[in-house]
């Protein structure tokens, strides 16, 4: 959790520096912004959005466990440094909340998942940014799952690992609105557990996930 807080503090610091640079640019020339005609060669872009996420399990180390994801809700804050007309570096913070229907030894479990993630993507923008092709990594800052069995709460474990590959395409449907489809593939296994009781631990197993995200962002 401490690492996640550090990432958030760093992101806020970048935002404040960026806004401060904009305010200074209104009165003094900014040596870090190259003007090309009336358009800045380097500029920042901000956005907020929502979307849906489906998580698939490519592999499960135990045949005794069955996992089926439910559609998750996503909210995100987006930030990009745009260089010229065609290139950008994109980042942000993503919050996801969803669920998994699990079964182990004939018993069903309703697992609730919560995730915080940070994408780091390179973006190629075509046709005046109407189409945005992007790829890079998506970092899992914090990921947890848990379930209630009787009156006891138990931890399911990590759903999204730290390192994930990401690729996507965004389309501008309005001047300030972008719809994006993104695929995320985990590079690490998640460590999970089911069937724990007050008397002892349950079955330990690993999973490898992939995700499909569809979202809409409003640019500011």
Predicted ranges, named:
Residues 52-58, 95-99, 126-128, 139-143, ...:
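Transmembrane beta-strands of outer-membrane beta-barrel pores
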Residues 81-85, 124-128, 173-175, 220:
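Outer-membrane beta-barrel strand-turn architecture
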Residues 154-155, 160-220:
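Predominantly the C-terminal beta-signal and adjacent terminal strand-loop region
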Residues 76-78, 119-123, 168-170, 215-217:
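Outer-membrane beta-barrel architecture
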Residues 58-64, 101-107, 145-152, 191-198:
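Outer-membrane beta-barrel translocator domains and adjoining extracellular loop/strand segments
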Residues 86-89, 130-133, 171, 175-181:
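Repeated loop/turn-to-beta-strand initiation elements of outer-membrane beta-barrel proteins
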């Amino acid at each position: 959790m401490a690492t996640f807080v550090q990432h958030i503090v760093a992101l806020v610091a970048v935002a404040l520096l960026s806004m401060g640079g904009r305010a200074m640019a209104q009165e003094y020339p900014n040596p870090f912004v190259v003007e090309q005609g009336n358009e800045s060669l380097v500029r920042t872009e901000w956005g907020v959005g929502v979307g849906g996420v489906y998580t698939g399990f490519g592999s499960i180390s135990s045949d005794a466990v069955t996992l089926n994801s439910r559609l998750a809700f996503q909210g995100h804050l987006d930030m990009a440094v745009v260089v010229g007309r065609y290139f950008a570096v994109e980042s942000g913070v993503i919050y996801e909340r969803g669920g998994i229907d699990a079964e182990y030894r004939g018993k069903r479990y309703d697992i609730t998942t919560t995730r915080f993630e940070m994408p780091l993507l390179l973006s190629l923008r075509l046709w005046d940014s109407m189409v945005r092709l992007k790829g890079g990594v998506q970092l899992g800052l914090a990921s947890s799952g848990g379930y209630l069995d009787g009156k006891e709460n138990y931890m399911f474990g990590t759903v999204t690992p730290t390192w994930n590959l990401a690729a996507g395409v965004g389309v501008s449907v309005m001047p300030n609105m972008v719809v994006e489809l993104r695929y995320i593939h985990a590079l690490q296994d998640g460590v999970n557990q089911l069937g724990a009781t007050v008397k002892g631990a349950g079955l330990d197993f690993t999973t490898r996930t992939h995700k499909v995200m569809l979202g809409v962002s409003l640019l500011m």
